[in-house]
Each structure stands twice: as structure tokens, then as C-alpha cells.
């Protein structure tokens, strides 16, 4: 199904300057969804602002993977009450995964009756229509689709970078890990047609983009439900043939579905970067079984070993949860041992967060908070130790770096990433932004590298 761009023309901003503000919580999928919301609004004539106080439209794109993300949304909504009282014409909209949870929309409208629009993950493309109804009819709009819809192509998108871009290749998840709400709020797996993906990337490349990251809750499941038989590895090889594309990445991979065909594609394809995000979640077989992950520690380690054999320069990142129900000290030590054996270059570490309507929420032996926090701190220390070792090994080497922009911490420095995703800061002129440059690493920091440009 194609987005109706002509409908936007009919509901454009006609008079004056109108600003919108979007705050995004959660993952890269949410980031891309927010880029689409921004794209639709800018197509209507609105302008984006980073100052929430001057906005006439405030949107919170929410996440529900962890309780902390939900609490941040509630806190921000509470702080909007005064702004709404000062400006009754302010329109407040909520969308994203949190809204898909059973009863959540009604709870929000009960606690925060000044919210104007609530919609979910399956109908974000209809936001301009909801906005128009609020503006013209003065109604409150709540519309949550229980079932996933046909994939909508051609939604305007406002990219936040001119160098690299996210491209979603599939939506939803069929795995039902016992701690996770994603299958309930994002729906079942469904894939975009390969030609739609290729056309989007070709357009991005023609506009100067150098790096593409393919997104999906489980990219290795790509191809299910399509008329054309195609695997994720085959898609990667097709995209690798696109002229002008410099780099290609993907996330997220489920270890049980990452095939050797994908590993060989990374090895063989010159544009595929030597970096894999491979969430392990736990190093304990008992906990992995309770999580419903469908692999064990030995299988994960064998996969990591095989990947390193085929792609010597590869770096791994991962997701790890501590404090899952029933996790013993011995289980946790197995996780620490796995972290030391694999030696990750980055890790997203989390304290287990109970989620309503998930099997893990009903499990016995919930872990006390003080134990969870102690294990979390020890895990972070073990992960960081491995990161430092990896960074030290980069000293003295020369890497190809894609210059992404100026450093967040020092606008006089440039920043970019190597093919294997190491962050490098270095001196250089802003004309280098968007270009590939050779950089020699002169110092390893805890979470980044310091380099100097080698003569081009």
C-alpha cells in the first residue's frame, strides 16, 4: 500500500509559522518512526523545534520494553500540564509501543485528560489525519489498531543525518521471548518487498548517503510471507551491488536464526561492515531456556567462534539482561564467563524489568533489587574491561573512517566510525564530513579512539 501524499496537500499549514517537537524513547525502529512523523509534518508546512515550549504540537514516541521508559513518559506528560494551561491550543500526541499495551491508552487519558491524540505502532501513517480532526473538529482522538496492517510505502521521512540512514526491511517479531512485549506491540513478522528496499537505498545513495543500516526486530527472519522467495543473505548480496553505496550494516540478529549464509555474505561482500550485533541475554543455559531463546551457551559460543574464523576483523556487540527470575549467582557467573570469552566491543546491559502480560512476569523467584543492581555493576565492569582491551589493540593501526560530523563533546573535533563500528575522534576540516578518510589511532580511550588523519 502506498502513502497518500496528495492528502497531505489538502491539510497543509496555511497561515503563519507552526512548530512541532518530537521526543523519542526506545530503539532505532522508534527513531525511524519519528523521522517519518517529522517527514509528514514538514510536508504539511510545519517546522521542527528543539524547544518544547515554543511548539504547537508535542509528540512523545514511546517505548515499553522497560518500566523506566514508561516512567519517563509519565513524568514528561505531567510537566506538560502547565504548558497546556498557558496554551490551550497546544496539541499533545502519544504514539509508539507503549500505546499498544492493553488498557494503557485509557489509563493515560484518565491520568492526563489534556492529551489530544493517541495512536499505536500500526497506524502512525494516519497521524496527519488525526491531527486534522483535532484542529478542525476539536475532538480527542484515540485509535489503536489491534492487528498489524499492510506495510505502507512512500511515507515522507525526515532523516536526521546526511551521511547515514536507517532502512527498515521488516516489522514485528514471532519469537515470544518470555520477558519481551515486542511481539504484542509490534505484531507478527512481515517483510518489505526487496525492490522497495532497493529503491529506497538507491534514492538515499543518489542524495549522497554513504552508509545504510538495515533494521528489523529479527532481520534474519526476512523474507517470510513474500511472494518472491528470498533469504536475508540473498537480500544482503543484492544490496551490496548498488552502485555508490559505501557501507552496509544491519541489526538486530537472533542467534538461533543467524545462518552461515549471512556470515559468508559479510565475508564476501565488500560493502558489508565487519560488525555484528548478536544479543546473548544470558550465559546460563537454564536462564536461556526460561527466556525461550531457543539456543544454548555452547551453540552461541560456537557461532561466535565460526564468525571470527570467517571474518577475522569482526567486532561483536550484544544485549544482556541481569536479574531474570530464578537467576542464581552461578547463572550470573556463567554470563560473566561468556562475556570474557567473547570479548564484546559494545554491550547494552539491562536490569530485568517486569512487563505485564509476559510469562516472565508470572514466574516465581523474582530477584531482589539490591541483588540485581549488584550484578549489573559487576557485569558492566566485565564488559568495559573487554572494551578497553579491544580499543588498546587498535592503537597504532590505520582505519578507514566514515566522517559523520563534529564530536558531541568537542565541536572542534570530527567524529566517525571504522568499518567495525569503533568510534574515532580526530582533528580535521568540516569539508571531510560525509567522506571516507584514513585515520591512524594514536590513543585508546575507554569507549572511543583518538586518531590523526593520514595524508589522503
Swiss-Prot record:
Monomer. The gene is miaB. This is tRNA-2-methylthio-N(6)-dimethylallyladenosine synthase. [4Fe-4S] cluster 1 binds at residues 27, 63, 97. It is found in: Cytoplasm. Its EC number is 2.8.4.3. [4Fe-4S] cluster 2 binds at residues 173, 177, 180. SMART domains: Elp3. Belongs to the methylthiotransferase family. MiaB subfamily. It comes from the Bacteria. Its cofactor is [4Fe-4S] cluster.
Amino acid at each position: 500500500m502506498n502513502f497518500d501524499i496528495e492528502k497531505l496537500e489538502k491539510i497543509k499549514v496555511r497561515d503563519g509559522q507552526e512548530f512541532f517537537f518530537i521526543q523519542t524513547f526506545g530503539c532505532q525502529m522508534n527513531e525511524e518512526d519519528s523521522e517519518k512523523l517529522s517527514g509528514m509534518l514538514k510536508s504539511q508546512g510545519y517546522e521542527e523545534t528543539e524547544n518544547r515550549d515554543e511548539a504547537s504540537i508535542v509528540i512523545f514516541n514511546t517505548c515499553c520494553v522497560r518500566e523506566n521508559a514508561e516512567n519517563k513518559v509519565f513524568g514528561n506528560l505531567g510537566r506538560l500540564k502547565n504548558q497546556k494551561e498557558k496554551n490551550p491550543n497546544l496539541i499533545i500526541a502519544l504514539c509508539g509501543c507503549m500505546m499498544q499495551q492493553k488498557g494503557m491508552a485509557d489509563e493515560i487519558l484518565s491520568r492526563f485528560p489534556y492529551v489530544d491524540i493517541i495512536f499505536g505502532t500500526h497506524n502512525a501513517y494516519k497521524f496527519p489525519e488525526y491531527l486534522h480532526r483535532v484542529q478542525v473538529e476539536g475532538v480527542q482522538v484515540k485509535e489503536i489498531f489491534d492487528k498489524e496492517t499492510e506495510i505502507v510505502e512512500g511515507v515522507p521521512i525526515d532523516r536526521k543525518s546526511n551521511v547515514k540512514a536507517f532502512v527498515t526491511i521488516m516489522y514485528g517479531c514471532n519469537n515470544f521471548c518470555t520477558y519481551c512485549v515486542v511481539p504484542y506491540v509490534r505484531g507478527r513478522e512481515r517483510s518489505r518487498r526487496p525492490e522497495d528496499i532497493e529503491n529506497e537505498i538507491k534514492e538515499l545513495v543518489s542524495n549522497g548517503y554513504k552508509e545504510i543500516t538495515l533494521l528489523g526486530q529479527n532481520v534474519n527472519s526476512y523474507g517470510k510471507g513474500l511472494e518472491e522467495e528470498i533469504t536475508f543473505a540473498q537480500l544482503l548480496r543484492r544490496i551490496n551491488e548498488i552502485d555508490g553505496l559505501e557501507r552496509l550494516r544491519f541489526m538486530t540478529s537472533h542467534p538461533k536464526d543467524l545462518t552461515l549464509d549471512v556470515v559468508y555474505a559479510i565475508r564476501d561482500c565488500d560493502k558489508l561492515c565487519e560488525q555484528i550485533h548478536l544479543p546473548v541475554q544470558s550465559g546460563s543455559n537454564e536462564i536461556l531456556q526460561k527466556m525461550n531463546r531457543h539456543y544454548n551457551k555452547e551453540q552461541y559460543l560456537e557461532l561466535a567462534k565460526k564468525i571470527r574464523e570467517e571474518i577475522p576483523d569482526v567486532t561483536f556487540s550484544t544485549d544482556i539482561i541481569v536479574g531474570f527470575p530464578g537467576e542464581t549467582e552461578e547463572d550470573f557467573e556463567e554470563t560473566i564467563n561468556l562475556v570474557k570469552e567473547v570479548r564484546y566491543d559494545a554491550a547494552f546491559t539491562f536490569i530485568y524489568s517486569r512487563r505485564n502480560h509476559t510469562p516472565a512476569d508470572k514466574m516465581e523467584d523474582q530477584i531482589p533489587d539490591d541483588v540485581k543492581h549488584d550484578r549489573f555493576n559487576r557485569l558492566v565492569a566485565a564488559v568495559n574491561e573487554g572494551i578497553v582491551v579491544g580499543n588498546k589493540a587498535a592503537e597504532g593501526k590505520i582505519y578507514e573512517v566514515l566522517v559523520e560530523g563534529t564530536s558531541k563533546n568537542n565541536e572542534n573535533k570530527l567524529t566517525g566510525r571504522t568499518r567495525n563500528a569503533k568510534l574515532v575522534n580526530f582533528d580535521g576540516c568540516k569539508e571531510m564530513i560525509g567522506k571516507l578518510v584514513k585515520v591512524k589511532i594514536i590513543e585508546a580511550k575507554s569507549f572511543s579512539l583518538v586518531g590523526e588523519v593520514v595524508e589522503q
